[in-house]
C-alpha cells in the first residue's frame, strides 16, 4: 500500500548560537531547498532568553536574525521569535501551540557540559515533544547517507512513512536495517555453565538442537518480512534502499553499523508515552540519540 504524501509544511527550529544549532539551521535550509513545496514551508526560528538574562535581549536575538537571514536569502519563509523562560519548557510549549510537522534542534547548546554527547535541553525536548524531532550534530554536513531502522512495530512503521516523505537531497544513499534478537536462545545447557542445575533440568528433550535451529530460522524469516514490508514503504516513494539484517543488541548494532558506513542520519521510531512515563522514550531510541555520533531523527508514535 502506498504511503500518503505528507509534506513538511511547518518547522520549529530551535537556535541558541551554538555550533550545533548553526548546523541545524543549515540542515533546515537543505531540507527546504530539496522539497518540491519549498515556498510553502514555514520555519519558526525560536530562541529562548534565560530568565536571568533579561537585559541581554539584543545579544540573544543576533543568532536568530542570522538564521532568519540565511533562510530568507534562499526564499525560505522564516520568522524569528525570542521568548523568555526555560529553554526546553519554552520549546515544548511552543510546539504544542504551533503543532509543527518537525522540531529541529542542535544536539548540544552553548551551556552544555564538556564531553557529553547530548545536551540537557535537546534531551528534554526529545522526551516531551509531541511531534518528530530532528537532532543535528556539529560539524555541519549534508545528509546524504541515511540509515532507517525497522523493528516491525507500529512506531517503526510511522518512522518509515515519515522517512519516505522527508525532503532529502536528491541522490541520497539509503540503508534499511533490522536487528534480530541476540542468539543463542536461552537453554538449560547454557544456564548450566553458570548455575548449578539438577540433572532433570538438563534433560535434552526440553529443548533440542533442532528446535533451537527452528527458532533461529523463524526469527530470520520474520526479520526478512519486516525488511520487505519496510522496503515497500520506501519504494512507494521511489526510494531504493540497501537492506541489511543483523543480529545482536539492537542499539549496539545500529550504532556500529552507522559508524562503519559513515551514516549522516539515523531514523528510528519511538512510542508516545503518558505524562507519568514521559521520562522514557524506549531503551533503543534513548541509546541511539545519546550515543550515535551522527544526527538522529526520532519519530514518535502519538498517544491514542
Kindly give the residue locations of the regions a language model identified.
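Gly/Ser-rich helix-loop-strand patches that form or flank binding pockets
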Residues: 1-10, 88-140, 252, 256-304
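Structural beta-alpha unit
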Residues: 1-6, 20, 30, 36-42, ...
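A generic structural signal for short
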Residues: 55-57, 79-80, 110-111, 151-152, ...
Amino acid at each position: 500500500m502506498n504511503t500518503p504524501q505528507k509534506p513538511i509544511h511547518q518547522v520549529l527550529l530551535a537556535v541558541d548560537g551554538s555550533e550545533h544549532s548553526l548546523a541545524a539551521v543549515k540542515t533546515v535550509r537543505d531540507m527546504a531547498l530539496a522539497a518540491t513545496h519549498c515556498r510553502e514551508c514555514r520555519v519558526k526560528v525560536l530562541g529562548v532568553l534565560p530568565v536571568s538574562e533579561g537585559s541581554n535581549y539584543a545579544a540573544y536575538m543576533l543568532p536568530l536574525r542570522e538564521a532568519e537571514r540565511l533562510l530568507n536569502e534562499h526564499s525560505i519563509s522564516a520568522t524569528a521569535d525570542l521568548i523568555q523562560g526555560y529553554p526546553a519548557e519554552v520549546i515544548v510549549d511552543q510546539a504544542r501551540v504551533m503543532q509543527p510537522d518537525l522540531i529541529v534542534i542542535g544536539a548540544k547548546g552553548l551551556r552544555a557540559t564538556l564531553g557529553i554527547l547530548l545536551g540537557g535541553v535537546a534531551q528534554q525536548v526529545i522526551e516531551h515533544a509531541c511531534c518528530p524531532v530532528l537532532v543535528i550534530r556539529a560539524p555541519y554536513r549534508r545528509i546524504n547517507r541515511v540509515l532507517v531502522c525497522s523493528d516491525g512495530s507500529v512506531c517503526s512503521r510511522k518512522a518509515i512513512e515519515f522517512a519516505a516523505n522527508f525532503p532529502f537531497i536528491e541522490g541520497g544513499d539509503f540503508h534499511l536495517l533490522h536487528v534480530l534478537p541476540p542468539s543463542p536462545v536461552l537453554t538449560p545447557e547454557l544456564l548450566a555453565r553458570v548455575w548449578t542445575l539438577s540433572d532433570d533440568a538438563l534433560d535434552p528433550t526440553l529443548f533440542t538442537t533442532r528446535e533451537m535451529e527452528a527458532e533461529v530460522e523463524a526469527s530470520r524469516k520474520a526479520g526478512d518480512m519486516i525488511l520487505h514490508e519496510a522496503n515497500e514503504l520506501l519504494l512507494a516513494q521511489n526510494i531504493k534502499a540497501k537492506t541489511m539484517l543483523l543480529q545482536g543488541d539492537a542499539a549496539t548494532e545500529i550504532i556500529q553499523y552507522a559508524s562503519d558506513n559513515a551514516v549522516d542520519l539515523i531514523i528510528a521510531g519511538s512510542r508516545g508515552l503518558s505524562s507519568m512515563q514521559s521520562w522514557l522514550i524506549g531503551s533503543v531510541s534513548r541509546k541511539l540519540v545519546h550515543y550515535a555520533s551522527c544526527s538522529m531523527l526520532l519519530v514518535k508514535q502519538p498517544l491514542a
